[in-house]
């Protein structure tokens, strides 16, 4: 299990635990269940790269945007 921290820059920091072999889509589904927003409306970013099929590691901090 890995833990990822998602910050939406509006004061919400969400810690999500997922398996290391889960995809970004699985991460979005778990995240949407925790914050109550549809998974299709979530965009995960770090700096200027948007995460679609990238590899994430334990303890990564991602920026959370709503489309």
UniProtKB/Swiss-Prot annotation:
Domain Ubiquitin-like stretches: 2-67
GO-annotated biological processes: mRNA splicing, via spliceosome; protein modification process
Compartments reported by the entry: Cytoplasm
Alphabetized InterPro entries for the sequence: Hub1/Ubl5, Ubiquitin-like_dom, Ubiquitin-like_domsf
Single GO MF descriptor: protein tag activity
Domain of life: Eukaryota
Cellular-component GO terms for this entry: cytoplasm; nucleus
Keyword field contains Cytoplasm: yes
Pfam families per the UniProt record, alphabetical: ubiquitin (PF00240)
Tagged with keyword Ribonucleoprotein: no
Keywords: Cytoplasm, Ubl conjugation pathway
Name of this protein: Ubiquitin-like protein 5
Native organism: Dictyostelium discoideum (Social amoeba)
């Amino acid at each position: 299990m890995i833990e990822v921290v998602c910050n939406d820059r509006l004061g919400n920091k969400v810690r999500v635990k997922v398996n290391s072999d889960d995809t970004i889509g699985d991460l979005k589904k778990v995240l949407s269940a925790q914050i109550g927003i549809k998974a299709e409306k979530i965009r995960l970013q770090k700096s200027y790269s948007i995460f679609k099929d990238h590899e994430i590691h334990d303890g990564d901090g991602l920026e959370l945007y709503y489309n």
